[in-house]
From Swiss-Prot:
This is DNA-directed RNA polymerases I, II, and III subunit RPABC5. The keyword Zinc applies. Zn(2+) binds at C7, C10, C44, C45. PANTHER family: DNA-DIRECTED RNA POLYMERASES I, II, AND III SUBUNIT RPABC5, DNA-DIRECTED RNA POLYMERASES I, II, AND III SUBUNIT RPABC5 FAMILY MEMBER. Keywords: DNA-directed RNA polymerase, Metal-binding, Nucleus, Transcription, Zinc.
């Protein structure tokens, strides 16, 4: 869905790092190197980006108000 603004465990702001993370992955960084470059050292914050599935574009195809 939408990337969480803060880490669920420690509360660090991570929402502003999603676009940068995707850019680093496009630039052939590994997942671990991209997270290190963004300054995400705690495993709780790292899992927030690694485990995120971006489904918002797919869900917009199923607007319930349109008939």
């Amino acid at each position: 869905m939408i990337i969480p603004i803060r880490c669920f465990t420690c509360g660090k702001v991570i929402g502003n790092k999603w676009e940068s993370y995707l850019g680093l992955l496009q630039a052939e960084y590994t997942e671990g190197d991209a997270l290190d470059a963004l300054g995400l050292k705690r495993y709780c914050c790292r899992r927030m980006l690694l485990g995120h599935v971006d489904l918002i574009e797919k869900l917009l195809n199923y607007a319930p108000l349109e008939k």
